[in-house]
A protein has these predicted regions:
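Glycine/threonine-rich flexible loop motifs
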Residues: 143-150
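A short glycine-rich, Lys/Arg-flanked "PGG" loop and its adjoining helix->strand segment in the class I
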Residues: 151-165
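Class I S-adenosylmethionine
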Residues: 1-108
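Short conserved loop adjoining the S-adenosyl-L-methionine
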Residues: 123-129, 144, 161
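Short beta->alpha hinge that forms the Motif I/post-I loop of the SAM-binding pocket
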Residues: 94-97, 119-121, 151
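A short acidic, Gly/Pro-enriched loop at the edge of an enzyme's catalytic core
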Residues: 126-139
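Conserved SAM-binding strand-loop segment of SAM-dependent methyltransferases
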Residues: 110-121
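Conserved beta-strand signature within the Rossmann-like core of class I S-adenosyl-L-methionine
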Residues: 166-172
């Protein structure tokens, strides 16, 4: 039974930010998108995130030693990939222009790190002239549903196209 802190409905999604039960964590809170957990964070130092965000951060920062790199994140969620991570440049693309303000005010409780572009992920990778060292694909409309236009061969070709020659593509 959740005690909802904030509920926001936009033209694209329903967002809920509220406390969650995670033993051993300081003030843990969740960011739900369409009733599915999109992001987790707490006030520990360093903060705890969802397992997959911890894993992505470990791959990019520890295993690949990314520093001073350009990272594209398709699907913003709670903006936790770049949270308190100053060593790289992040660009988030999300179809909902309201997600950043909601995440900053109610979930992160601080400014999100990185550039935010309100656009459809497929259109962005199809038309962008920019190139990135990594593309992280994290686009869900619910816990088990990826928008169908983001699982096409053309989408993946365009996601690859915006990579620099030695770039990596990571998908959740």
């Amino acid at each position: 039974n959740l005690h909802h802190e904030v509920t926001a409905d936009t033209a694209y999604d329903e967002y809920i930010v509220g406390p969650t039960a995670l033993p051993g964590q300081q003030d843990p809170r969740a960011f739900w998108v369409n009733k599915s957990t999109a992001s987790l964070i707490d006030d520990s130092e360093p903060p705890n995130y969802t397992r997959y965000i911890n894993h992505l951060r470990r791959i990019l920062l520890d295993e690949l030693q990314f520093r001073d790199r350009d990272i594209l994140v398709l699907g913003a969620g709670g903006f936790t990939l770049s949270h308190r991570e100053p060593s790289n440049r992040y660009t988030y693309v999300d179809i909902d222009p309201a997600i950043k303000a909601i995440a900053e005010k109610h979930f992160l409780r601080e400014a999100a790190r990185g550039e935010f572009i309100a656009d459809d992920a497929r259109r962005f990778v199809a038309t962008s002239e920019r190139r990135f060292d990594a593309v992280v694909v994290d686009v869900y409309s619910s816990h088990t549903s990826i928008p169908s236009h983001l699982v096409t061969r053309e989408f993946w070709e365009d996601a690859r196209r915006v990579l620099k020659p030695d770039g990596v593509l990571l998908a959740n």
